[in-house]
């Protein structure tokens, strides 16, 4: 599956993103019997069913939520979906605007924004804009990055614009006009700690990522 990335026609393709996902996964299944059972169960799922896609996306988001509940040391925090929807209702994004989350976690903000905008897409061009030129995110943690990509794919965005990087490590002076976005939908990256080199990017030099 990792070869998907090498054989893809470009980074903005479903094949490339699938390769990204499996490139980050380090788990191994040593029992052939267990692997066969997993494959058999997976084969019964209809991934083209919108209902099953949403169920799977909820499972991925629950994983992030459980990571946070197990202890805040990992810096994983789950934002309740009703709160996200309320924020989107206040902002009222429009098709053609770009939406960015610099610490996107499971991409809950981006998924909910897509669900808000999708009914407003009356033309094929609108759907193409939502698919390719609307939602952008960055995520530092490997597992959350993988879950974000899977979550967006399951919601209907086939080639998510999610980058595996630490947003706080970027020098503000290097940000160009093309890197700007119309809307930022995000929570501060609660619960994390940053090394001193990263702190140099900010006027207030503290390790706490939320500040």
Language model: regions and residue ranges:
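Phosphate-binding glycine-rich loops and adjacent basic patches that engage nucleotide phosphates
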Residues: 1-5, 16-26, 44-53, 106-115, ...
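Mobile active-site "lid"/loop adjacent to the S-adenosyl-L-methionine
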Residues: 126, 190-211
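Non-catalytic, mostly N-terminal accessory regions of nucleic-acid modification and defense proteins
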Residues: 1-95, 161-170
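Residue-identity detector for glutamine
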Residues: 2-3, 50-53, 92, 131, ...
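Conserved S-adenosyl-L-methionine
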Residues: 74-186, 191-195
């Amino acid at each position: 599956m990792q070869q998907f990335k090498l054989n893809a026609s470009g980074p903005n393709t479903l094949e490339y993103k699938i390769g990204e996902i499996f490139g980050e996964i380090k788990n191994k299944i040593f029992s052939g019997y267990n692997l066969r059972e997993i494959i058999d169960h997976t084969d019964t799922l209809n991934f083209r069913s919108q209902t099953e896609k949403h169920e799977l996306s909820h499972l991925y988001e629950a994983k992030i939520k459980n990571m946070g509940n197990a202890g805040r040391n990992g810096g994983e925090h789950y934002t309740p979906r009703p709160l996200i929807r309320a924020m989107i209702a206040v902002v009222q994004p429009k098709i053609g605007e770009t939406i960015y989350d610099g610490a996107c976690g499971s991409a809950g903000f981006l998924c909910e924004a897509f669900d808000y905008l999708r009914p407003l897409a009356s033309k094929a061009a609108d759907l193409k804009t939502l698919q390719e030129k609307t939602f952008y995110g960055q995520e530092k943690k490997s597992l959350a990055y993988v879950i974000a990509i899977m979550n967006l794919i399951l919601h209907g965005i086939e080639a998510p614009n999610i980058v595996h990087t630490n947003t706080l490590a970027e020098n503000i002076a290097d940000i160009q006009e093309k890197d700007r976005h119309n809307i930022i939908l995000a929570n501060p990256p609660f619960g994390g700690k940053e090394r001193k080199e990263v702190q140099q990017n900010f006027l207030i030099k503290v390790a706490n990522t939320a500040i």
